[in-house]
């Protein structure tokens, strides 16, 4: 999706087992005033791919190539969940084209030894990806809704061949690369956070003034933190007005 005119350009990247349609409220608003871009990553939505291509490194390279091909300048990269890693990786590859980054309800799936982080993530899947995906996504919502059910069902339907490879590779990237990626960001960073995730994958809602290890890490790299309370993991869908307000204020 590539619509709208106006600077600065905004590029939106979805999360694990998700699609660009998760940005529907943001795309509808910002295409009126900005050039907006949203893509389906390999193996997601309408974009084909092979399991060996599913990694944060591949996705970041794809987004960086898209930025170059569209000749975006002073762009703001906006990622949700896994998309936070992707925009950080893309910004590392094309730093001169990126003015800032917005990270929406990001987290860290692995730390310490990358091999151990990847192995632990594979063990968590346990050979039953649909059950893993349902457990993972059910915990992202605190209130029942038709939209929540649809997002969980989409994740369960997603390719086990992709998901069972991508999740461990994401944990490995978190352990190996997140600090260096944050250190190379030249532009500003805004974190819009609504939940904290534990090692058991369980999420808890955040209140204003609360923090988490992930947010403390971001603060150490100069990020601005904004808490959106009483909201699940899909902050941009559950609290679109607040998210859009924060994006509009930051991306100037």
Predicted regions and their residues:
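Conserved loop-alpha-helix segment in the C-terminal half of the alpha/beta-hydrolase fold
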Residues: 188-231
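Short N-terminal helix/helix-N-cap motif within the alpha/beta-hydrolase-1
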Residues: 20-28, 46-49, 85-86, 112, ...
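Alpha/beta-hydrolase fold catalytic core
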Residues: 1-11, 31-34, 73, 142, ...
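Conserved hydrolase catalytic core segment
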Residues: 72-112
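Active-site loop/oxyanion-hole signature of alpha/beta-hydrolase fold enzymes
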Residues: 28, 37-78, 82, 228, ...
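Helix-rich cap/lid subdomain of alpha/beta-hydrolase
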Residues: 104-154, 158-183
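Conserved HGGG/HGGXW glycine-rich cap/lid loop of the alpha/beta-hydrolase fold
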Residues: 2-49
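Catalytic histidine-centered segment of alpha/beta-hydrolase-like enzymes
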Residues: 228-240, 244
């Amino acid at each position: 999706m590539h619509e709208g005119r106006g600077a600065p350009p905004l590029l939106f990247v979805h999360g694990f087992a998700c699609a660009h349609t998760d940005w529907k409220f943001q795309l509808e608003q910002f295409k009126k005033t900005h050039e907006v871009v949203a893509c389906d990553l390999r193996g997601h939505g309408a974009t084909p791919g092979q399991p060996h291509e599913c990694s944060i490194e591949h996705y970041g390279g794809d987004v960086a190539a898209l930025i170059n091909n569209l000749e975006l300048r002073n762009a703001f990269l906006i990622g949700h969940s896994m998309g936070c890693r992707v925009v950080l990786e893309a910004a590392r590859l094309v730093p001169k084209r990126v003015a800032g980054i917005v990270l929406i309800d990001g987290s860290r799936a692995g730390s310490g030894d990358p091999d151990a982080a990847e192995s632990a993530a594979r063990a968590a899947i346990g050979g039953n990806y649909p059950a893993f995906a349902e457990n993972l996504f059910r915990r992202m919502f605190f209130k029942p809704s038709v939209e929540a059910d649809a997002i969980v069902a989409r994740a369960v339907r997603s390719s086990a061949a992709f998901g069972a490879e991508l999740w461990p590779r994401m944990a490995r990237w978190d352990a190996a690369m997140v600090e260096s990626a944050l250190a190379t960001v030249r532009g500003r960073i805004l974190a819009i956070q609504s939940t904290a995730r534990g090692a058991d994958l369980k999420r808890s809602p955040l209140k204003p003034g609360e923090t988490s290890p992930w947010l403390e890490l971001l603060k150490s790299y100069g990020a601005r933190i904004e808490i959106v309370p009483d909201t699940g993991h899909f902050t941009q869908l559950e609290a679109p007005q607040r998210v859009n307000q924060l994006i509009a204020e930051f991306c100037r």
